[in-house]
Amino acid sequence: MTDLSRYRNIGIFAHVDAGKTTTTERILKLTGKIHKIGEVHDGAATTDFMEQEQERGITIQSAATTCFWKDHRFNIIDTPGHVDFTIEVYRSLKVLDGGIGVFCGSGGVEPQSETNWRYANDSEVARIIYVNKLDRVGADFYRVVKQIRDVLGAYPLVMTLPIGREESFIGVVELLTRKAWIWDDSGDPMKYEVKDVPAEMADEVEKWRAELVEKAVEQDDEVMEKYLEGEEPDVDTLKRLIRKGTIKLDFFPTYCGSSFKNKGVQLVLDAVVDYLPDPTEVKPQPEVDLEGHETGEFAIVDPDRPLRALAFKIMDDRYGALTFLRLYSGRLEKGTTVLNTATGKTERIGRIVEMHANQRNELDSAQAGDIVAVLGMKNVQTGHTLCDPDKPATLEPMVFPDPVISIAVTPKDKAANEKMGIALGKMVQEDPSFHVETDQESGETILKGMGELHLDIKVDILKRTHGVEVNVGKPQVAYRETITRRVEDEYVHKKQTGGSGQYAKINYVIEPGEPGSGFVFESTVTGGNVPREFWPAVEKGFRSMLGKGVLAGYPCVDFKVNLTDGGFHAVDSSAIAFEIAAQAAFRQSVPKAAPQLLEPIMKVDVFTPDAHVGDVIGDLNRRRGMIKSQEAGVTGVRIKAEVPLSEMFGYIGDLRTMTSGRGQFSMEFSHYMPCPKNVADEVIKEAQERAARK
């Protein structure tokens, strides 16, 4: 087993085209894991191993890869850059100790880089920054450094400077050692020379080095005092201080290079060893009780403590189901039994494997700090905790956002219905942000996800991986309904047949709840007019109606009910009578409470060349968008807006047309807002027509 201080669990995250997968490939080549480097643009990269990824050139699934550099063990999680897969980024950040943020030397801080950066800040993940593609036309390292400061509000601690620009980029100057690394044109990462700094760069190097030293010495008062008295700290002291500041997130060591041309990647690997934390140097995971409240205990990273492991990804491949685990404490051994705290059931550990993209090495055991996959687990889902059955505990679970878009699918071949059901069951296990439901009335299968591309990929996986071709309906928006007026009302349910009948009377108030509150029920009944044992039945009755609002059948949210009074009959009253009364009361009173349709509003971040700004803003306005800000950069303008999801279908094609293929955008859910009357009327009309057809 590797000593824990030599572990680095890291993620590589970036915008779609910043060169993240290429960078991962170069790391694997340098660490001796692969012999021929795969290029993304010919669909052969090692970590992009789903067909959909290789075809689209974007990374969808976090492939876990283990490799070694300078006697340190790297577990690398390759994360996707497209916004519809942000769930994968969030999921991998949960299990990482550090990260490499890759930025494009010409594109700079692009919309998705900002989203991923924000997630990493929320997860308190220490990072180093790598500005890639400096061989590209228009690449400018110094501009990207300024953008990182201005747009991300982060402090990039510049560690290397580029030698040459664009096609004449030949290497980097390492500021700490004042040495120049210069590669030849062979493309071999090992063919480089370490020389003195080029004379024409000497002043620039000293300026940036002084800034580096001044920032580093702030980490230690004693070193700072000596520095102010004129004593320069040695390189080892500076490295110690940079490590301390990086782990505290005070700054982010920043490197430059070109992964495609194999220039500069070694220094990034050295930085992972020198500055990113080992598993014992990050905050331990809190343990929680069954209700999700913290117990005050922590999963300390120590192989000798009881087992605590988090299942952070489920994947199905040709060998069966793979469950990826991050071990926080204890050991996991082949043939032993562990407890899944989410299900209360035990699982036997069969084969443990260390993953290298889609290849694997079998292991007999794993320890705290490891990221491994286990084959053949039956009832484990993403976010479940596996622990020692004799000393159970639950780790803080992952929280996933609700889907905002849905499509109906039917198999082209009716005989494939069962096959589709099995395939979708596996896909839901693999991706908690993907939901599958059956429309009770039409019998159609409804897929729900985080965006158009997310669902496109799912349909593709059905076809390629599972051999099920489907007909796809047009995308549907996840509207919601609410009420806007307080209504005081009563309802009496009476049913008399032979024998005992049914009787329940309820007096109640329904009113709008706080935004985001969902459904709130309370009872202020006094004097026993509605016995306490029937209150839960009243709540259950109202709650059972929330799934289908009165306007267009969409779920009802932000809805408050207060049971104020009522009446009962000693013989005829029962829980079921009160439940039926509450259901009828919902149907009676909600139409009086000025019901309103709500629509999902998306945060949209668009990048466009200067020449097309007017067209893009005009188009967003036509889509009922509200422009929040626009920011001029060197290569174009970033526009941030809030736009209803219903207006954003097919936007990527329209944006490319408007900007001659150069525009980019990212989009994520923001909040729900009331629909304008004309939109609401149209949605309600469509819903009524759909209902009439069923």
Swiss-Prot record:
PROSITE patterns reported for this sequence: G_TR_1, G_TR_2
GO molecular function: GTP binding; GTPase activity; guanosine tetraphosphate binding; translation elongation factor activity
Gene Ontology biological process: ribosome disassembly
Keyword presence, Cytoplasm: yes
Protein name stated in the entry: Elongation factor G 1
Stated family: Belongs to the TRAFAC class translation factor GTPase superfamily. Classic translation factor GTPase family. EF-G/EF-2 subfamily.
Keywords linked to the UniProt accession: Cytoplasm, Elongation factor, GTP-binding, Nucleotide-binding, Protein biosynthesis
SUPFAM superfamilies found in the cross-reference section: EF-G C-terminal domain-like, P-loop containing nucleoside triphosphate hydrolases, Ribosomal protein S5 domain 2-like, Translation proteins
GO cellular component terms attached to this protein's record: cytoplasm
Function description: Catalyzes the GTP-dependent ribosomal translocation step during translation elongation. During this step, the ribosome changes from the pre-translocational (PRE) to the post-translocational (POST) state as the newly formed A-site-bound peptidyl-tRNA and P-site-bound deacylated tRNA move to the P and E sites, respectively. Catalyzes the coordinated movement of the two tRNA molecules, the mRNA and conformational changes in the ribosome.
Naturally occurring in which organism (per UniProt): Methylococcus capsulatus (strain ATCC 33009 / NCIMB 11132 / Bath)
Lineage: Bacteria, Pseudomonadati, Pseudomonadota, Gammaproteobacteria, Methylococcales
Subcellular location: Cytoplasm
Domain tr-type G: 5-280
